[in-house]
């Protein structure tokens, strides 16, 4: 599995830093991943749905630690690149997420 596209949509909230959409192997899109600033730094939260009992259940998630680590590394690298471009004034408006 290769992450072939990462789109970062920054938000200005306390802990939530961005929503992210990824494309796998040019053929499968996962939306609404979140970049969150936790007590130990940035991490990725998988898209989830709130259940009737108030708990959240992942809609999609990696099945092993290696895949999760690869996803987190690629997404956070792209998030950091996006931040640096925005600070340097080089950021072009993100394309609409119409996939």
Swiss-Prot record:
Biological process according to GO: division septum assembly; sporulation resulting in formation of a cellular spore
Keywords in alphabetical order: Cell cycle, Cell division, Septation
Segments passing through the bilayer: none
Keyword Metal-binding: no
Database matches in SUPFAM superfamilies: SpoVG-like (SSF160537)
Superkingdom, taxonomy of origin: Bacteria
Function summary: Could be involved in septation.
Family: Belongs to the SpoVG family.
Protein name: Putative septation protein SpoVG
């Amino acid at each position: 599995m290769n992450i072939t596209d990462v789109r970062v949509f920054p938000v200005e909230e306390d802990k939530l830093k961005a929503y992210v959409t990824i494309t796998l192997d040019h053929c499968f899109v996962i939306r609404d991943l979140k970049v969150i600033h936790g007590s130990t730094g940035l991490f990725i939260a998988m898209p989830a749905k709130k259940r009737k009992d108030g708990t959240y259940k992942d809609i999609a998630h990696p099945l092993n630690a290696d895949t999760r680590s690869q996803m987190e590394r690629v997404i956070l690298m792209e998030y950091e690149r996006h931040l640096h471009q925005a600070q340097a004034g080089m950021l072009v408006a993100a394309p609409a997420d119409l996939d």
